[in-house]
Amino acid sequence: MSSHRDGAGADRITIKIHNMKRSASRSPGPASRSSLSRNSRSMGRGYDNGSGVPGDSPERLSPERMRRRLDRSPSRYGSPHREPYMRGPPPAERPAGYKVLCVSALPPKAPDDFIEETLYREYKKFGDFSVRLAHDLDERVAYVCFRTPEDAREAKHHKPRLIIYDKMAIVEPVYKSTTRPEYRPRGHSMSPPDYERYHYSRSPMGQGVPLDHRRPPIDPYDRYGPPHMHPHAVHPRDYRPLHHDYPHPPRGPPLHRGGHPHHLHGHAPPHQYAPMRPLAPRPHAPYEKPESKKDKFPNYLHHVQPEDDPLSTRTLFAGNLEVTIADDELRRIFGKYGVVDDIDIKRPPPGTGNAFAFVRYQNLDMAHRAKIELSGQYIGKFQCKIGYGKVTPATRMWIGGLGAWTSVTQLEREFDRFGAIKKIEYQKGEPYAYIQYETVEAATAAVKEMRGFPLGGPERRLRTDFAELPGATPAAPFKSSKPPYDESALEYRRPEYDPYYEESAAYAPRGGYSPYPPRGGYRGRGGYRGRGRGMYHYHNDVHRPPHPGSLAGSSSSVPPPGGVEDEWRRPPGESYDRGARSSSREPGVERSRSRSPLKRARSPGSDSDTSTRRNDALASASTVPDVARKCSTVWTGALILKSSLFPAKFHLTDGDTDIVESLMRDEEGKHNLRITQRLRLDPPKLDDVQKRIASSSSHAIFMGLAGSTNDTNCDDASVQTRPLRNLVSYLKQKEAAGVISLLNKETEATGVLYAFPPCDFSTELLKRTCHSLTEEGLKEDHLVIVVVRGGTA
């Protein structure tokens, strides 16, 4: 090695540097070489002491020193500004997934609103996402933030290029990396003082302070949620750009409003949509905790997802507005986030406070997006507070959170339990649908109970709200070639909504074990198979022929009699269970504490010979005709379902005969009882009926058989008489019981009547007194009627 040291000086310097890197034990050379080696080690560590070394060239500077020199040189600031965020980490450091796409090369003449709407239109089919526009020094870019990496990858694969204003825009993925502390995402949910403190980093006072010393590093994806919250606790789909068309700010330091991904790099490019004044006071020291918007509006950052918020609605309340603000100004600002149906501004008398407004959007998704983006932002001179307004019930409801997994069959199956569905509007693949009910009560129950329901799985929960009634006249209904009878004049009425079933639904699961085989097809609606992608309109007066051999629990698709099945739906809360079916009741069920003479006859201390003889006679009855012969007919009349009247007669098998005269009449005093609701034969609901029987002051159980038309008296010319077997067949096919609310206006006594088709539960009720009944003997069409005093349906 000595021969090399005797060579030229330049050779000696080169050899000495390499030797020092290989071994720290080599003896130091001359002073000039030692100085050079110290500079080399300093560059290797990336240490910056704030002073340059004469003779340093850019080729010998570390990347960290290059970055800091760019920070101190405004003229060289623009080029690397967005590069780390757009390109992400080097390929070796890139993780497998990304959630953000960067769209660059945007045409300068395209307005921001046009770009946003174009991106929403192009990417809405790939999943939930938000769009943010960032204005760099030399260009404008858009960031599309998806909820999941899978959605982002699919969107990138199918849309690698976009055409905007006849110009090709470039789509690049933004990789998540935790290795670079300078990646500083900044969400709009961060407090304004952070924005102001951020701008101080560019002042002369903060130039020499490294970025990492001014603020600790945070998760690169922290902007997807509110402060102090896990980044995945809030869905990114709820965030859109935080800007309005404010006038250009005065010359001077930029006042950024936040919410754009270019905060990742420790730079604050000017923003043309800045507010007219800072959002919060400038802090006195870098570590001083300043006053934030959250102190003024404590809950403005706390945004509950609509599927979890019972107060969510498409109407927003906007408070703290200028008294002189115009309708057009509010419509322009709020219109950025969706279609605004109506704006109502309330202006107090001068000097009594600020104005406020109610803004009604077309649907809940739009309203929630606006609530997220505008709450706490400046509208005019004042900082605005956004909340939900008052719910406006209607017969038409909106369902959000849908997707390619949703079908009309599924919607009809889940929503028909709340009442008569008039129409379903859904286009395959769309994220929303509309369902129109016959009554406001049915729609109210559906909106309340189906909010947050996981229709497409645990991660796909429904959003529900009321919607405007369409102005167009519904299309003409489909007519079957062989209807059993005309139901064109069917009417549907429902009683007032009853909170009792709201409470009973709380402990009823939405799913469960079904002892019956799965029902095939479209729940008996096989005629709807094979629909295309066009808008589907579901009407309630569709006629299809009945299936004479339909049985309860059958897996065949069997339509009910006379098109009634499409018009008659479940009452609110009567069963929100999914998949469960009726099962055999266990023996020894608790019996009612009724004043029934028959019950006293079975009691040990009873001395009623008549009741005892009747009980003994029923005990030997083995068929339906036997029961009819051995029981007296205590009620004759008709059951009415829409425009169909079914003559019937009831034979008392157990309970209190006083119920007949006190409750079993209509408003005019006639024995015509109208079925308005239905109860699904699910175990939780049947248990609820059993509890009502046991806890009521009195009850009665009847066997219902076909009656004579001579015993009916109905003045409604639109009502047509049908045989009772049609109603029995319908209830069997629907696996449901008819429900009637009973009311005596004179005594204000109330009660509920249940009409059960032949099933395990109804058989068990009959066997309370008719112990010898067999399955063979119950094949004849009949109903089991249960009347419970007290309560409402």
Swiss-Prot record:
Compositionally biased spans, kind Basic and acidic residues: 285-296, 566-593
Occurrences of domain RRM (ranges): 314-391, 395-469
Domain SPOC: 624-791
Keyword Transmembrane on entry: no
SUPFAM superfamilies on file: RNA-binding domain, RBD (SSF54928), SPOC domain-like (SSF100939)
Molecular function terms from GO: mRNA binding; RNA binding
Principal place of residence: nucleus
Subcellular location: Nucleus
Maturation and modification: Phosphorylated by Hipk at Ser-23, Ser-25 and/or Ser-27; the precise position if phosphorylation sites is unknown.
Signal sequence coordinates: none
Pfam family, one: SPOC
Keyword annotations: Developmental protein, Differentiation, mRNA processing, mRNA splicing, Nucleus, Phosphoprotein, RNA-binding, Sexual differentiation
Job description of the protein: RNA-binding protein that acts as an associated component of the WMM complex, a complex that mediates N6-methyladenosine (m6A) methylation of mRNAs. M6a modification plays a role in the efficiency of mRNA splicing and is required for sex determination. In the WMM complex, may act by binding target RNAs and recruiting the WMM complex. Required for sex determination and dosage compensation via Sxl alternative splicing: m6A methylation acts as a key regulator of Sxl pre-mRNA and promotes female-specific alternative splicing of Sxl, which determines female physiognomy.
Oligomer status and interactors: Component of the WMM complex, a N6-methyltransferase complex composed of a catalytic subcomplex, named MAC, and of an associated subcomplex, named MACOM. The MAC subcomplex is composed of Ime4/Mettl3 and Mettl14. The MACOM subcomplex is composed of fl(2)d, Flacc/Xio, Hakai, vir, and, in some cases of nito. Interacts with Sxl. Interacts with Hipk; leading to phosphorylation.
Family to which the UniProt record says this protein belongs: Belongs to the RRM Spen family.
Name of the protein in question: RNA-binding protein spenito
Species of provenance: Drosophila melanogaster (Fruit fly)
Upper lineage: Eukaryota, Metazoa, Ecdysozoa, Arthropoda, Hexapoda
